[in-house]
Amino acid sequence: MTTFYTVVSWLIILGYWLLIAGVTLRILMKRRAVPSAMAWLLVIYILPLVGIVAYLSVGELHLGKRRAERARAMWPSTAKWLNDLKACKHIFAEENSAVASALFQLCERRQGIAGVKGNQLQLLTSSDDVMQALIRDIQLARHNIEMVFYIWQPGGMADQVAESLMAAARRGVHCRLMLDSAGSVAFFRSPWAGMMRNAGIEVVEALKVNLMRVFLRRMDLRQHRKMIMIDNYIAYTGSMNMVDPRYFKQDAGVGQWVDLMARMEGPVATAMGIVYSCDWEIETGKRLLPPPPDANIMPFEQASGHTIHTIASGPGFPEDLIHQALLTSVYAAREYLIMTTPYFVPSDDLLHAICTAAQRGVDVSIILPRKNDSLLVGWASRAFFSELLAAGVKIYQFEGGLLHTKSVLVDGELSLVGTVNLDMRSLWLNFEITLVIDDAGFGADLAEVQDDYISRSRLLDARLWVKRPFWQRVVERLFYFFSPLL
């Protein structure tokens, strides 16, 4: 019996070390950033069992077998649709401004289509303005309404949007709503999901959280897009979830969320429609291609029409494109660069690009919320401040609530707005969307919004920053080391 227990003990020890060695080899063989690999290895060696379970759960990008098969199956029809769209040469821009040219060329080569021109854009900077405009557009909708949100939180004006959407469905408008399972958990636990389905709305719970499948699909891969398409001609996107800030996370101690949305009319709605089509097919298996190009996507004749490229990220979309777009934008800056984000945990490449821009004389400003709803990200963000300040970057801490706007403005002409945070999850993992706009008029509008943010912010003083307590520096460096995992 003693021999039996001895053999079993040695087999357990051998299996334990083989498991650690196997996961180590798996990490080393995966193409990933070195800091991320080192962080994972450290976690596994310090807490082997916890680290291995965590890595197998959230360390690799698993879309799930069924969704991955759908993503592969949809591309032939999607490619044909894109080729048909290319035949509508009148909607595509033939040239761009000097500051935007490299980025638009990158997007065209990687996504297969050029930026679309002749769009009309309107920046909406308050939740009331967004929801009032949306309710009006829903009431006028005639054919179809598609929406996707990370969070839909019942309460306040969000309920008025829901009521108008149900009324549209009852009068025959085809309405589809896709919401992230984790972000919209309060919605799916409320009566609203059933009420909408009873009204005729197709409601889909995207990337459903299921702990029984934790090793088969990455549970923290989330549908983070915020998009609305109406009649294939009107579109919205930006940072705002379908929430009324007066009713959302009031106990978080960060104030009301501050967001920005863009309302668009023109052919960009068609480009966004194909993104929604791909998301819908990956999640449901149902093909929902936008209608073929026709006169409805004729561009505006006014010279003020905006040129826009839509960048989508996530499994099934061009890998690393949003990260490349941000790098290209930063390196294109010659005069000034303004960035707003609620969560700032940049890649090494992006951090160095921002610092280099400041060191070569570009006026670089980053606007962040002073109080953050994520303790981990808040501390990790602070770990980058010293390097940024030393390079000459101005860091503004917004004091008017949780600044949730994601925007980049380069030299007053190239703008990026959408759902992408400057952190690892948005850059490498989630389903995201960003609009790239080449237009000085829109740039002036965005600059006005950013100036308002700055007026409600406190400029971080580099001299005071270096005097912060030692314990804060220790906590910052700890979270900095694990920032590749956040």
Swiss-Prot record:
Q: Which gene encodes it?
A: clsA
What reaction(s) does this enzyme catalyze? 2 a 1,2-diacyl-sn-glycero-3-phospho-(1'-sn-glycerol) = a cardiolipin + glycerol
Q: What is this protein called?
A: Cardiolipin synthase A
What Gene3D superfamilies does its record include?
Endonuclease Chain A
Q: Which GO molecular function annotations are given, in alphabetical order?
A: cardiolipin synthase activity
Q: May I have one GO cellular component term?
A: plasma membrane
> Which species does the entry assign this protein to?
Cronobacter sakazakii (strain ATCC BAA-894) (Enterobacter sakazakii)
List the keywords (alphabetical): Cell inner membrane, Cell membrane, Lipid biosynthesis, Lipid metabolism, Membrane, Phospholipid biosynthesis, Phospholipid metabolism, Repeat, Transferase, Transmembrane, Transmembrane helix
Q: Which residues form the PLD phosphodiesterase domain?
A: 219-246, 399-426
Protein family membership: Belongs to the phospholipase D family. Cardiolipin synthase subfamily. ClsA sub-subfamily.
Asked if the record carries the keyword rRNA-binding, the reply is no
- Which PANTHER family does this chain map to? CARDIOLIPIN SYNTHASE, PHOSPHOLIPASE D
Topology with respect to the bilayer = Multi-pass membrane protein
> The organism sits in which domain of life?
Bacteria
Q: Tell me, what's a Pfam family for it?
A: PLDc_2
What this protein is reported to do is described as:
Catalyzes the reversible phosphatidyl group transfer from one phosphatidylglycerol molecule to another to form cardiolipin (CL) (diphosphatidylglycerol) and glycerol.
Task: Mention one GO biological process in which this protein takes part, according to its record.
Answer: cardiolipin biosynthetic process
- Enzyme nomenclature, EC number: 2.7.8.-
Regions that span the bilayer: 3-23, 38-58
